């Protein structure tokens, strides 16, 4: 069975291949340079994931997966949310996004720094049938970065599952409890039933 993953992220492609196991051929945007990524202008992770998957499925005619994910901080009314990657501005890097997050949480006590990573994975069939799978992982935002592993907000996110920051966790530890792997595992189980 052929699967298209609407991403250029090789890490996501490797993760999907591992979750699916044998009998699946996985393609991504790098394999189809003529496909331009969909514009992510939805108002939720789910909307953005569906837009990306539907756009790519209409062009490839393959089973297509796309995800949208980010950090949701309760004390910030859900921000950065769908703007996680560009929280400090359109071309902001991880350092700038983390600095803005810490600045906004300066006066927020530890007990009120609850947060979660959220992922929506949209799966679109070759005929356009759409199913969405969601995953999340709970934690809190630390007062300073802790660890050098991962990317994005990982050094600031203290995982309730791991009892350490994602910045201290190995890739295998993080992937065992991450929002994306939880959502993607559900999507892979669904695909295996249809193989």
Which residue stretches match the model-derived regions?
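Anionic-ligand binding patches
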Residues: 2-4, 11-195
